[in-house]
Amino acid sequence: VAVKKIMKPFSTPVLAKRTYRELKLLKHLKHENVISLSDIFISPLEDIYFVTELLGTDLHRLLTSRPLEKQFIQYFLYQIMRGLKYVHSAGVVHRDLKPSNILVNENCDLKICDFGLARIQDPQMTGYVSTRYYRAPEIMLTWQKYDVEVDIWSAGCIFAEMLEGKPLFPGKDHVNQFSIITELLGTPPDDVINTIASEN
């Protein structure tokens, strides 16, 4: 088993909400490509411990150790998308999909983990989401109106990183991130830009 320690989860309202949300989601999400929660306990110091299955490494460590062969890339991407399909069908947006939140065992079985930033789908979302390299443009432009597509964008960024061996959009900040995206993908046509509404 693996044990995830959350120190002082009740020290702030934000941390308490995040811990509760992750616990609630892990309790209900049951899929072979999503980490499963087997137990939970609280220490006398009020630290919380999530007990999950043990997988040997994460995708980030694999990517930094050696290039991946194409058949592994295909199998990993298949499992990521399969796990996301299940998570999304449950009405959940992960919001922080990145290689270090994807666990892998010695049989190349893959599981999505770390649901601390995940949310039930809602017309009004919050802006604090996803590690910058894997952040969808709509979060940068209209951070309150996004949906499961942001996880698909992140999965695409992870796919490109598996192929290239490095992050596709390694932005230093929001502006640089968006600049790198438009340099690679081009500027959207005016009719697309005109459909983007921002309340920021």
From Swiss-Prot:
Q: Which domain of life is it from?
A: Eukaryota
The active-site annotation reads 96
Q: Which UniProt keywords apply?
A: Activator, ATP-binding, Cytoplasm, Kinase, Nucleotide-binding, Nucleus, Phosphoprotein, Serine/threonine-protein kinase, Transcription, Transcription regulation, Transferase
The reply on keyword rRNA processing is: no
Q: Where is the Protein kinase domain?
A: 1-200
One GO cellular component assignment for this chain's record is: cytoplasm
Cellular localisation: Cytoplasm; Nucleus
PROSITE patterns assigned to the protein according to its UniProt record, in alphabetical order: MAPK, PROTEIN_KINASE_DOM, PROTEIN_KINASE_ST
Q: Which residues bind ATP?
A: 4
- Locate the motif TXY: 126-128
Q: Which residues carry this modification: Phosphothreonine?
A: 126
Phosphotyrosine modifications at: 128
> What Enzyme Commission number does this protein have?
2.7.11.24
The protein in question is named: Mitogen-activated protein kinase HOG1
Give the organism the record lists. Gibberella intermedia
